[in-house]
From Swiss-Prot:
Function in brief: Binds together with bS18 to 16S ribosomal RNA.
The organism's place on the tree of life at top rank: Bacteria
One GO cellular component, as annotated: ribosome
Gene: rpsF
Protein name in the entry: Small ribosomal subunit protein bS6
UniProt GO BP: translation
PROSITE patterns registered for this protein in UniProt: RIBOSOMAL_S6
The family this protein is said to belong to: Belongs to the bacterial ribosomal protein bS6 family.
Keywords: Ribonucleoprotein, Ribosomal protein, RNA-binding, rRNA-binding
Disulfide bonds: none
Pfam families according to UniProt: Ribosomal_S6
GO molecular function: small ribosomal subunit rRNA binding; structural constituent of ribosome
Amino acid sequence: MHQYELMVILDPEIDERTVAPSLDKFLNVVRNDGGTIDNVDIWGRRRLAYEINKKSEGIYAVVQLTATGDTTKELDRQLKLSEAVMRTKVLRADEAIAQVAAAQKRADEKAARKAAAAEKTVTEKVGV
């Protein structure tokens, strides 16, 4: 079993009070296969970066769970069949951490190059 993170964007037309119970229905797939739900974090209504199904907002939810790969595939399949679900993304937690670390490393390297270039420019101006 592995740790996974699931992000779901739900249709903004559904009532926000029904988000948790409807998610719980889907998460029973994980529980029935012997997995566990570690954390459910409902972010609420947020503006989308781009329109999905002609909608500019969505209700975001992030779920941390422990399950097998087959269980997460079945969960993702069932979520995609629901009309209330606009988008889903399932990531293995260790892969997500590696992606964040790689992005941070690239940002640090870029900042270091920028600082070195700025220092070189200042040194050249002072030396002239």
